């Protein structure tokens, strides 16, 4: 498979998508953060010094999704049509699982946007409770599904 972000002289480039037709595109990404019982309970009970952790993580995930093109060099600025976030509580493992769904009608996919949103949301949780638990583990950041575009659909 040819790398599309390199020109014929092996220099980096942003792919030209102007000849591609617009299609509806949706990507869902997820990731987890595992922590101590003390940190988990502080979040659940809204008893942290920095405020409402999960609500702030959702806002951060939305912002991260919107700002992906400013963080990942070869990502196109996109006109997103929607971003949804959901946080699953997994108390038996002191874990939160964050899902981000990004949507648009456009010429390129939104996988990187969904993945970036998840990453920023999880990092925000870490930042807000690191005073309680510095050993938190962020893991399993992954694409769950995508639809639309030339490469077709994907579902994990």
From Swiss-Prot:
Active site: 127
Keywords, ordered alphabetically: Lyase, Molybdenum cofactor biosynthesis
Region annotation (Disordered) ranges: 1-21
Residues reported to bind substrate: 74-76, 112-113
EC number(s) on file: 4.6.1.17
Disulfide bridge map: none
Catalytic activity from the UniProt record: (8S)-3',8-cyclo-7,8-dihydroguanosine 5'-triphosphate = cyclic pyranopterin phosphate + diphosphate
Entry GO MF terms: cyclic pyranopterin monophosphate synthase activity
Source organism, top-level taxon: Bacteria
The protein's annotated pathway: Cofactor biosynthesis; molybdopterin biosynthesis
GO biological process, any: Mo-molybdopterin cofactor biosynthetic process
Purpose: Catalyzes the conversion of (8S)-3',8-cyclo-7,8-dihydroguanosine 5'-triphosphate to cyclic pyranopterin monophosphate (cPMP).
Family as reported in the entry's similarity comment: Belongs to the MoaC family.
Record note on quaternary structure: Homohexamer; trimer of dimers.
Protein name: Cyclic pyranopterin monophosphate synthase
Encoding gene per record: moaC
């Amino acid at each position: 498979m040819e790398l599309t972000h390199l020109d014929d002289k092996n220099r980096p480039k942003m792919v030209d998508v102007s000849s591609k037709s617009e299609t509806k595109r949706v990507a869902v990404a997820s990731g987890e953060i595992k922590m101590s019982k003390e940190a988990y309970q502080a979040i659940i009970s809204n008893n942290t010094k920095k405020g409402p952790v999960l609500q702030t993580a959702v806002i951060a995930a939305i912002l991260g999704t919107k700002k992906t093109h400013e963080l990942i060099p070869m990502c196109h600025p996109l006109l997103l049509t929607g971003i949804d976030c959901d946080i699953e509580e997994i108390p038996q493992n002191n874990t939160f699982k964050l899902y981000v769904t990004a949507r648009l009608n456009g010429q390129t996919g939104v996988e990187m946007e969904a993945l970036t949103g998840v990453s920023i949301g999880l990092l925000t949780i870490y930042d807000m409770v690191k005073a309680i638990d510095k050993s938190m583990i962020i893991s399993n950041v992954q694409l769950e599904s995508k639809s639309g575009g030339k490469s077709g659909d994907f579902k994990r």
